[in-house]
Amino acid sequence: MKKGQDAYGREVYDYFKHGTGCEIVERDDGLVSMSTGPDAYFTEYRDWGAHLKKAIAFVRGRVLDVGCGAGRHSLYLQKKGHDVLGIDTSPLAAKVARLRGVKRVRVMPVTKVSSRLGTFDTIVMLGNNFGLFESRKRARWLLNRFRSITSEDARIIVETVDPYRTDERHHLNYHKFNRRRGRMSGQTRLRVRYLTYATPWFDYLLVSPDEMKQLLEGTGWRVAKVFRSKGPAYSAVIERL
């Protein structure tokens, strides 16, 4: 990643150091919006939604935290006694995670995980990081790759947003826009901006619980539990078959 592309990392680093920062999200249909802000990446367990607290209780053994960011989930799991490896594509976010006390962090994309990292009992993709699967095709490829780095009774703990739980016209129109292009309704193409920084464009996959179950068919994984929030966010426990 080039220095000027680490918008996410820069906002996280500035918030960590100075308590300032914001996050602008630009979608490929022209929608520009402010996210909840970098403070969300530093929340403690007491601030998490009930759906997340229920799901994270199913973590066991050695953990791979995919898209660890500033390390909020890694830190919690470390305190619970888990051996955690956090990975993130953002060098600055990884730096912040280390500064905050995450013992093992690597700068790498999820597509590069391999048996060289060892064997994991749980993979966590929280903070809506189910989205890192990006598309139906890539999800199935990654799920197969995950089988090569996990124990026989492994779990994947995920969090995402049900894209259909909205009545906002610009989101509903975007679903139609995606389907016309042969994409999943919640297959969002976006980039993050902060000051003069901008990430490359990337896909971020949002799915309903039913779509998640369909996506996992034939992959050697299954959705075991779903925990809904009062809004569109939900978490799920995925088990290896």
Predicted segment positions?
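Conserved SAM/SAH-binding loop
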Residues: 70
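Conserved alpha-helix/loop element of class I SAM-dependent methyltransferases that forms part
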Residues: 42-62
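Conserved SAM-binding strand-loop segment of SAM-dependent methyltransferases
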Residues: 101-112
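A short glycine-rich, Lys/Arg-flanked "PGG" loop and its adjoining helix->strand segment in the class I
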Residues: 139-152
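N-terminal auxiliary segments of SAM/dcSAM-dependent transferases
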Residues: 1-26
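Conserved SAM/SAH-binding beta-strand->alpha-helix loop
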Residues: 90-91
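A short SAM/SAH-binding and catalytic strip from SAM-dependent methyltransferases
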Residues: 120-140
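SAM-dependent methyltransferase
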Residues: 2, 151-213
